[in-house]
């Protein structure tokens, strides 16, 4: 089963601002979702997960019944959780 990846507007905006090397590395990590990488569920959230890509964090939700990974935000380690 292959998941469809949906990148929300705030995450896409962050990606567009990044240098090509960082952007490629983040996109490659996102393509491995939902099961590959340094992934942890976010405390206090039912279906929100965190993927670590170097100094960046990718926050996403899983919609297993629809086979959708929804990337809701991407940011630097200190800023993405705010």
Walk through the language-model features, giving the residues of each.
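Short histidine/acidic/glycine/proline-rich micro-motifs that form metal-
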Residues: 12-13, 48
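Enriched for short, Lys/Arg-rich terminal
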Residues: 1-6, 13-16, 21-24, 53-56, ...
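A short, surface-exposed loop/turn module that caps and links secondary-structure elements
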Residues: 28-51
């Amino acid at each position: 089963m292959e998941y469809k990846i949906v990148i929300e507007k705030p995450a896409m905006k962050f990606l567009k601002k990044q240098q090509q090397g960082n952007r490629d590395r983040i996109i490659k990590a996102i393509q491995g979702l939902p099961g590959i990488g340094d992934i942890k569920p976010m405390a206090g959230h039912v279906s929100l997960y965190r993927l670590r890509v170097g100094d960046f964090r990718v926050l996403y939700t899983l919609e297993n019944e629809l086979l959708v990974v929804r990337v809701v935000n991407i940011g630097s380690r200190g800023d993405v959780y705010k």
